[in-house]
Amino acid sequence: MSAHLAMPSYGSVRCGHYYWPSPGSMDSASAAEAPAADLSLTTEQKTPCHPDASPASSSSGTLIQYTPDSATSPTADHPSHRPTFQKVKDKGESGTRKAKSRTAFSQEQLQTLHQRFQSQKYLSPHQIRELAAALGLTYKQVKTWFQNQRMKFKRCQKESQWVDKGIYLPQNGFHQAAYLDMTPTFHQGFPVVTNRNLQAVTSAHQAYSSGQTYGNGQGLYPFMAVEDEGFFGKGGTSCNTQQAMGLLSQQMNFYHGYSTNVDYDSLQAEDTYSFQSTSDSITQFSSSPVRHQYQAPWHTLGTQNGYET
């Protein structure tokens, strides 16, 4: 008795994309059944898959046909990849994205919008609809125009405040400077940095009356800097302008005949403080217009007492 008669007879089993023939008809039916599996793809998908006919559970039979996955076969036809390829192709043919269209307002529309903005910066949704209907525009166009106009108005307002003050926003490490005004008015700012440098930012036009003199305690040059550690002192003490300038006057000895039209270049405050001045009419020190630098020792008011004039 042959081996084919001893084994039980059962038909071929189809499970999805797999074709599992019987052992007896493996040689003869493989060539005929393999094309039939390609034609009846929809019937094979509806046929339930039996677990006892899987290749792992059966020791007899041979795998006849295997349809590869789309991820492993470049020629596989998967319907889910077609729309993506089509989108990429369409995007490649069109090139870059289209720019957003800008609304071209007429002169009458712009005039009406500006007049309304001058009287009312914020509009309610109902007012926006009414204005859009009156101008022949859409709700979004009017709303966007008012938003852009408010941003421009705030930016211009902030810049005008900076120009009026003559300063910009303070950065880290800088303190706001204060100065005194005397008749005639003279404005001079002293930005004080953290390393105790005091730089004098002088103006190009300085107006002093001819009756002002230095050293008498009344017509002193006014300057004062706001700092946490005090004015020209490291011990936390403070002094007024008359005491500071009285000390300068005693060290420099120019009480009489000194011109008041002085161009101050810089005033630096560190461990040793220097005072620089230039003048074209100095007769007491030199006969030619040169630059003089005077070094004056500064002392803390807590230890020095007799410098006030």
From Swiss-Prot:
Basic and acidic residues: bias regions: 87-96
Bias kind Low complexity: ranges: 25-41
Comp. bias (Polar residues): 55-75
Keywords, comma-separated and alphabetical: DNA-binding, Homeobox, Nucleus, Transcription, Transcription regulation
Short name of one Pfam family: Homeodomain
Induction, as annotated: Strongly down-regulated during embryonic stem cell differentiation, induced either by retinoic acid treatment, or by cell adhesion prevention leading to embryoid body formation.
Keyword Transcription regulation applies: yes
Native species: Gallus gallus
Listed name of the protein: Homeobox protein NANOG
Residue ranges: DNA binding: 98-157
UniProt record similarity statement: Belongs to the Nanog homeobox family.
InterPro entries to which the protein is assigned, alphabetical: Distal-less_Homeobox_TF (IPR050460), HD (IPR001356), Homeobox_CS (IPR017970), Homeodomain-like_sf (IPR009057)
Top-level taxonomic group: Eukaryota
Keyword Transcription regulation set for record: yes
Cited function: Transcription factor required for the maintenance of pluripotency and self-renewal of embryonic stem cells.
GO CC list: nucleus
GO MF terms, alphabetically ordered: DNA-binding transcription factor activity, RNA polymerase II-specific; RNA polymerase II cis-regulatory region sequence-specific DNA binding; transcription cis-regulatory region binding
Annotated stretches, region: Disordered: 24-104
